[in-house]
């Protein structure tokens, strides 16, 4: 409840709750600790180029679809990528490989989705440089690493930084917890590219090359019946529709369903939420729709008809051209 209240204050410019300013001392403390963390970090350089995908705001902005797009584009251009991630929400911090059969509570929901969708090696670890070393030892053919959600992990040296936003932009422009920013907007000046998931409500004040990303919905597929797919049109008149989302910005998923003509009773959950069967009981008399990230955690829990909506990132090829040019510069150096 508190997290949702804060997000409304951060991103709705019409809301100016005086209570928010009581958190200013915490914002100054957070900013100071963040600066100290970056100052004290000793970046570890890996033997292959590293592309970091992250954001300076809290919550989901589309990093995972972008990482999948990058893996696919790099492979198409002859590169052999691997992916490292912390694996938020998992039970341990140890370095380990992620396979399609891994358990989400052991590796994290996003790394598991990346392993199932990307077709490239995926490893997780609290210390991404150590995870990267383990991945490279196990897969010596890998010649570029993607670090998912690693912008603030300064212990890992990087060659390319990609910063992701969604249509909400930088919100009220304040640091946590007064606003949604992990780092100041001025941080964008040192990034290689800014990617906005959708048309931003306000332009970001940066001269860094910017690219728009759109998430194209695919066909729904059944969680409990392999190989069965359906269009949004075919689901409209099938019965009562419900939707859940435990992602950084659940409303984005619910708006996508609306854009497909699907009217649903919605249920948001916190990002990286660990589902239990009772969480899905609200949809027992109808059809439940969810994201792919939620589906990897709900296997075996669904009592009724459950469908998943996959999405695929679409971006200008100019972005991958920019990235490949920088990677080749690293090889020459």
From Swiss-Prot:
Record pathway: Glycolipid biosynthesis; lipid IV(A) biosynthesis; lipid IV(A) from (3R)-3-hydroxytetradecanoyl-[acyl-carrier-protein] and UDP-N-acetyl-alpha-D-glucosamine: step 6/6
EC number: 2.7.1.130
Catalytic activity: a lipid A disaccharide + ATP = a lipid IVA + ADP + H(+)
GO biological process: lipid A biosynthetic process; lipopolysaccharide core region biosynthetic process
Keywords, alphabetical: ATP-binding, Kinase, Lipid A biosynthesis, Lipid biosynthesis, Lipid metabolism, Nucleotide-binding, Transferase
A cellular component annotation (GO) from this entry: plasma membrane
Entries under Pfam families matching the protein: LpxK
Entries under InterPro entries matching the protein: LpxK, P-loop_NTPase
EC primary class: transferase
Binding, ATP: 57-64
Keyword Ubl conjugation: no
An example molecular function term from Gene Ontology annotations: ATP binding
Family: Belongs to the LpxK family.
Role played: Transfers the gamma-phosphate of ATP to the 4'-position of a tetraacyldisaccharide 1-phosphate intermediate (termed DS-1-P) to form tetraacyldisaccharide 1,4'-bis-phosphate (lipid IVA).
Protein name per Swiss-Prot or TrEMBL: Tetraacyldisaccharide 4'-kinase
Source species of the chain: Dechloromonas aromatica (strain RCB)
Organism lineage: Bacteria, Pseudomonadati, Pseudomonadota, Betaproteobacteria, Rhodocyclales
Gene: lpxK
């Amino acid at each position: 409840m508190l997290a949702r209240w804060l997000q409304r204050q951060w991103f709705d410019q019409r809301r100016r709750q005086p209570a928010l300013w009581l958190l200013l001392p915490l914002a100054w403390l957070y900013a100071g600790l963040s600066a100290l963390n970056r100052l004290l970090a000793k970046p570890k350089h890996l033997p292959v180029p590293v592309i970091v995908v992250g954001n300076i705001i809290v919550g989901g902005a589309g990093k995972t679809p972008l990482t999948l797009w990058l893996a696919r584009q790099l492979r198409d251009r002859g590169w052999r990528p691997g992916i490292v991630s912390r694996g938020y929400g998992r039970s341990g911090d140890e370095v380990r490989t992620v396979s399609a059969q891994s358990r989400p509570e052991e590796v994290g929901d996003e790394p598991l989705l990346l392993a199932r969708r990307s077709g490239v090696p995926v490893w997780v670890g609290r210390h991404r440089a150590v995870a990267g070393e383990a991945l490279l030892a196990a897969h010596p053919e890998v010649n570029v690493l993607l670090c998912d959600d690693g912008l603030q992990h300064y212990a890992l040296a990087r060659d390319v930084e990609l910063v992701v936003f969604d249509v909400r932009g930088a919100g009220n422009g304040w640091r946590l917890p007064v606003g949604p920013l992990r780092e100041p907007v001025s941080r964008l000046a040192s990034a290689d590219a800014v990617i906005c998931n959708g048309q931003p409500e306000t332009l970001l004040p940066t001269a860094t090359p910017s690219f728009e990303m759109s998430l194209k919905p695919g066909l729904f597929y059944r969680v409990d019946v392999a190989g069965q797919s359906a269009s949004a049109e075919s689901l409209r008149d099938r019965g009562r529709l419900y939707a859940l989302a435990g992602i950084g910005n659940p409303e984005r998923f619910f708006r996508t369903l609306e854009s497909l003509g699907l009217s649903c009773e919605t249920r948001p959950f916190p990002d990286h939420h660990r589902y239990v069967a009772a969480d899905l009981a609200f949809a027992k008399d109808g059809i439940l729709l969810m994201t792919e990230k939620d589906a990897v955690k709900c296997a075996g829990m669904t009592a009724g008809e459950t469908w998943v909506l996959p999405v695929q990132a679409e971006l200008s090829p100019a972005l991958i051209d920019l990235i490949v040019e920088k990677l080749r510069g690293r090889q020459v150096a």
